[in-house]
């Protein structure tokens, strides 16, 4: 059975803060940070935005792009590490907002930055089994980094929704296969009640990101009998600009393959939306017949790899909703004081 992406939608808040502004507060070297991270500014949610509102906006764009009846959606899964409620699903909010309720199932996913792609895989399973007609998978976050912590320079806000189906005439992209690589690696964590996550610093690199991304990618390539040169585009989880660039080189992918989907320099790390944002940006540009190789990463730790082929339908649906490039243009820049207010870093009680 053929399973794939019927539609997709993204959302990025319009507010931005530059690396220079954060560095100014903490006395850090902005140029060294920009060169090391390959990130120059990051998205900031508005005061009334959270992972749920971002997920709703992304889902609405996916529905506008698809043109399908929302009552056909049998499952809504939202992946995030910043769900607004500890007990109250984000996914029911999204489902109600897009008109998919009540004859459907919903659940929230957590797996650090790959919760969104885990939701995609779950939807693939439900759709493939015939249990549901369509499944909506979302990755959305308003990620947090403690003041002056390295994460504060990249932790951003944004989300992407993917409508998964099996009707070949509706598919804008076919998901040929997927492969996951998972271990218990404590590279990044946040306990209940902690306002900010903690991490292992450099430990998040080799034993975390690179081990899982490269093994996940190699596993799928071997499973398919494919090579990097078989693909027109490649997307890897984007905690910064340096890591996906290095991972691509390690695996044999070129700079030309990853550049179209490399959005992190302009918006930062959208966590659960990160890899999906790269896929969305690539779908915005890809032609029918193009192949996309994507690998998401989530701390804790694991990776999900996907092989995707774009269909003719992409040309029909692409411009029905804002593209990623349209969403990130014309930003509104704010200073650290306003950023702290937007991010809830100023606590009065």
Swiss-Prot record:
Pathway: Metabolic intermediate biosynthesis; (R)-mevalonate biosynthesis; (R)-mevalonate from acetyl-CoA: step 2/3. CoA binds at residues 202, 242. SUPFAM superfamilies: Thiolase-like. (3S)-3-hydroxy-3-methylglutaryl-CoA binds at residues 29-30, 113, 154, 204, 237, 246, 269, 299. The keyword Acyltransferase applies. Its EC number is 2.3.3.10. The keyword Transferase applies. It catalyses: acetoacetyl-CoA + acetyl-CoA + H2O = (3S)-3-hydroxy-3-methylglutaryl-CoA + CoA + H(+). GO terms for molecular function: acetyl-CoA C-acetyltransferase activity; hydroxymethylglutaryl-CoA synthase activity. Gene3D superfamilies: 3.40.47.10. Keywords: Acyltransferase, Isoprene biosynthesis, Transferase. GO terms for biological process: farnesyl diphosphate biosynthetic process, mevalonate pathway; isopentenyl diphosphate biosynthetic process, mevalonate pathway. InterPro entries: ACP_syn_III_C (IPR013747), HMG_CoA_Synthase (IPR004656), Thiolase-like (IPR016039). The active site is at residues 81, 113, 237. Interacts with acetoacetyl-CoA thiolase that catalyzes the precedent step in the pathway and with a DUF35 protein. The acetoacetyl-CoA thiolase/HMG-CoA synthase complex channels the intermediate via a fused CoA-binding site, which allows for efficient coupling of the endergonic thiolase reaction with the exergonic HMGCS reaction. Belongs to the thiolase-like superfamily. Archaeal HMG-CoA synthase family. Catalyzes the condensation of acetyl-CoA with acetoacetyl-CoA to form 3-hydroxy-3-methylglutaryl-CoA (HMG-CoA). Functions in the mevalonate (MVA) pathway leading to isopentenyl diphosphate (IPP), a key precursor for the biosynthesis of isoprenoid compounds that are building blocks of archaeal membrane lipids. This is Hydroxymethylglutaryl-CoA synthase. It comes from Methanosarcina mazei (strain ATCC BAA-159 / DSM 3647 / Goe1 / Go1 / JCM 11833 / OCM 88) (Methanosarcina frisia).
